[in-house]
A protein has these predicted regions:
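Acidic helix N-cap motif at the loop->helix transition within catalytic regions
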Residues: 31-35, 56-65
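A conserved acidic beta->alpha catalytic loop
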Residues: 51-60, 78, 108
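Acceptor/aglycone-binding surface of glycosyltransferases and processive sugar-polymer synthases
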Residues: 72-95, 100, 112-195, 221-232
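Hydrophobic helical membrane-anchoring modules
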Residues: 2-15, 190-192, 196-332
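Cell-envelope/extracellular polymer assembly enzymes that use nucleotide-activated donors
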Residues: 19-21, 46, 200
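Short beta-strand/loop segment that forms part of the nucleotide-sugar
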Residues: 37, 45-54, 74-75
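Short, well-formed alpha-helical segments that are part of the catalytic scaffolds
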Residues: 27-43
Length: 332
């Protein structure tokens, strides 16, 4: 019997590899950027170097010395910060038709050979956004400066609160990958352009219910000096994380849905506030009149605080389990 046209078609067509673009924001990276570019593998289709008004002429150095046809250099007239440079690269990558966009720093601390591992969960439809995690391997922490370990522990906890990704660590890690559909849905014009960039992206992804996955990695530390001043960024990060916590809780539990967790939060806060206000009032009264508060007064102040704290603990328990599990980009 002669085969029909349908018989000639493959039963299990091979899925084409996604077009991957790498964005490398640069500021004072002339010492390392050429080595980083040389180590980017063949799986990457385009490489976008963004010169963020570098005083050392990183962009010019790449143009003059890198012959890789995949490399394109964009230049800022003024410094916009790591976030601003990255988003310039993101926009250009989308214009080029990239399906997955990787952010890779130009300081040599990240191994470009790990790009396939970073991209794999997104290409397989298991995640919308992936990021490196330098804390996954305990022995590797010995090579991390102590100030970075301490700072990352604090920033990771704040990021968990503001983003809702309780299973994600190392939020300031700049080795990331994102699906282009998710990237198009992000309000890039609202995202912080400076050092808060990565944490702000996680917050925006949390509002979208995008799936974020950590990828274990090792960072290489040389003699480069970090541009981040911990004493300077801590107050800024505290304020921005606090605002993002308020926005996330309001949108997640009072706009997008309203359930038992929302009630637990509202009632728990009311009970706590009432108990504290009532207790403070009678404590002040007893100090002025020198008359001890009665047992009933103490119980009436303590009981709402106890009940309120239990309700708030129940809300936090629900929130920590309310981490997105279903990737969003296949639905867009």
């Amino acid at each position: 019997m002669n085969p029909t046209p349908d018989d000639d078609e493959p039963r299990n067509p091979v899925r084409m590899a996604p077009m991957i673009a790498v964005v490398i924001p640069c500021y004072r990276e002339a010492r390392h950027v050429l080595d980083v570019l040389a180590r980017v593998g063949a799986e990457v289709g385009r490489i976008i170097v963004v010169d963020d008004a570098c005083p050392d002429g990183t962009g010019r150095l790449v143009r003059e010395n890198c012959k890789d046809p995949r490399v394109e250099v964009l230049t800022h007239d003024r410094n916009k910060g790591v976030g601003g440079a990255t988003m310039t690269g993101y926009r250009h990558a989308m214009e080029l038709g990239a399906e997955i966009v990787v952010k890779l720093d130009g300081d040599g601390q990240m191994d470009p050979a790990m790009i396939p591992e970073l991209v794999k969960p997104i290409a397989a439809g298991e995640a919308d956004y992936t990021k490196g995690n330098r804390f996954h391997q305990f022995l590797a922490l010995g090579r991390m400066p102590p100030v970075r370990i301490t700072g990352n522990m604090l920033l990771s906890f704040l990021s968990k609160l503001s983003s809702g990704y309780w299973d994600v660590f190392d939020p300031t890690n700049g080795f990331t990958a994102i699906h282009a559909k998710i990237l198009r849905a992000l309000p890039l014009e609202k995202i912080s352009e400076r050092f808060f960039f990565e944490s702000d992206v996680l917050f925006r992804l949390g509002l979208m219910r995008a799936v974020v996955k950590d990828i274990p990695m090792q960072a290489r530390y040389g003699d480069e000096v970090s541009a981040i001043s911990i004493p300077r960024i801590i107050p800024e990060f505290l304020i921005k994380h606090y605002l993002n916590v308020c926005r996330r809780v309001y949108y997640t539990y009072f706009v997008r849905e309203f359930g038992f967790a929302s009630i637990q939060l509202v009632v728990g806060k009311l009970f706590m506030l009432f108990g504290l206000a009532y207790g403070i009032y009678w404590w002040h009264d007893s100090t002025v009149t020198d008359i001890p508060a009665t047992a009933g007064t103490v119980v009436l102040a303590a009981l709402p605080i106890i009940l309120g704290s239990q309700l708030l603990i129940a809300f936090i328990n629900y929130d920590t389990r309310n981490v997105p599990r279903r990737p969003v980009h296949p639905l867009l």
